[in-house]
Curated annotation (Swiss-Prot):
One of its GO terms (molecular function) is tRNA binding. Keywords: Ribonucleoprotein, Ribosomal protein, RNA-binding, rRNA-binding, tRNA-binding. Located at the top of the head of the 30S subunit, it contacts several helices of the 16S rRNA. In the 70S ribosome it contacts the 23S rRNA (bridge B1a) and protein L5 of the 50S subunit (bridge B1b), connecting the 2 subunits; these bridges are implicated in subunit movement. Contacts the tRNAs in the A and P-sites. NCBIfam families: uS13_bact (TIGR03631). It comes from Desulfotalea psychrophila (strain LSv54 / DSM 12343). This is Small ribosomal subunit protein uS13. The lineage of its organism: Bacteria, Pseudomonadati, Thermodesulfobacteriota, Desulfobulbia, Desulfobulbales.
C-alpha cells in the first residue's frame, strides 16, 4: 500500500482516483501529477513501486499544498474574512451560505436541522 502525504492510498483503484483521497488534490490535480511523472491514469495503485511513489511524492511536495497545511490555509482564509467584517465573513460567522443562495426555504446544510417555533423563542 502506497503512503503519500501521510495518507494510505486505497488498494485496487485507478491511481488518478486514489490520489483524490489526499485532501487538496482533486481529479484534475491528480491527472496533472500523473502527466508530470508520465504514468497512465488507469494504472492501479497496487502496481506502484517505491521509485514511482517517490516521483509522485516529489511532484506533490513541490507544487501542491495538501492535508494539514491546506486545511490550515483554508481556515486562515475564512478567519481573515471574518476579521475584515466583509459580507462573506459575516455569512461565515452566522453559518449561512456565502454565495448568494436563497435562505428562506433551503440552506439546511449550513443552517442545521429545522427548529420548531417553540424552540426558537
Amino acid at each position: 500500500m502506497a503512503r503519500i502525504a501521510g495518507i494510505d492510498l486505497p488498494k485496487n483503484k485507478h491511481i488518478d482516483r486514489a490520489l483524490t483521497y489526499i485532501h487538496g488534490i482533486g481529479l484534475t490535480s491528480a491527472r496533472k501529477i500523473l502527466d508530470a511523472v508520465e504514468l497512465p491514469y488507469t494504472m492501479n495503485s497496487d502496481d506502484l513501486d517505491g521509485e514511482t511513489v517517490n516521483r509522485i511524492r516529489k511532484v506533490i511536495e513541490a507544487d501542491y499544498t495538501v492535508e494539514g497545511d491546506r486545511r490550515r490555509e483554508v481556515s486562515m482564509d475564512i478567519k481573515r474574512l471574518t476579521d475584515l467584517g466583509c459580507y462573506r465573513g459575516r455569512r461565515h460567522r452566522m453559518g449561512l451560505p456565502c454565495r448568494g443562495q436563497k435562505t428562506k426555504t433551503n440552506a439546511r446544510t449550513r443552517k442545521g436541522p429545522r427548529r420548531g417555533a417553540a424552540r426558537r423563542k
